[in-house]
């Protein structure tokens, strides 16, 4: 019998994640750490939200770069929102924002808006 469930990939959803940047940037030379961090965040969003297009919020970019190119935060709390594109109703994209928390070592949660 065929699977009759609808795929959850096409739904609009928002989730909070904690991403361990130190694990992803270990061994990267100093002058490439912050640019690589942005690339790793985009790859993380593509993998977890299963969209090709990822848009990074300017506040997240400032959060990554606030201590310079070398000293990227060890952990970041991210809010990933899968949204519908304005041009094409079927196209989905992921919008990545930084979440300001005192302790970023929290669990992944689903955000109700």
UniProtKB/Swiss-Prot annotation:
One of its GO terms (biological process) is cytoplasmic translation. Component of the ribosome, a large ribonucleoprotein complex responsible for the synthesis of proteins in the cell. The small ribosomal subunit (SSU) binds messenger RNAs (mRNAs) and translates the encoded message by selecting cognate aminoacyl-transfer RNA (tRNA) molecules. The large subunit (LSU) contains the ribosomal catalytic site termed the peptidyl transferase center (PTC), which catalyzes the formation of peptide bonds, thereby polymerizing the amino acids delivered by tRNAs into a polypeptide chain. Pfam families: Ribosomal_L31e (PF01198). Component of the large ribosomal subunit (LSU). Mature yeast ribosomes consist of a small (40S) and a large (60S) subunit. The 40S small subunit contains 1 molecule of ribosomal RNA (18S rRNA) and at least 33 different proteins. The large 60S subunit contains 3 rRNA molecules (25S, 5.8S and 5S rRNA) and at least 46 different proteins. InterPro entries: Ribosomal_eL31, Ribosomal_eL31_CS, Ribosomal_eL31_dom_sf. GO terms for molecular function: structural constituent of ribosome. It comes from the Eukaryota. One of its GO terms (cellular component) is cytosol. Keywords: Cytoplasm, Ribonucleoprotein, Ribosomal protein. This is Large ribosomal subunit protein eL31. Belongs to the eukaryotic ribosomal protein eL31 family. It is found in: Cytoplasm. The gene is rpl31.
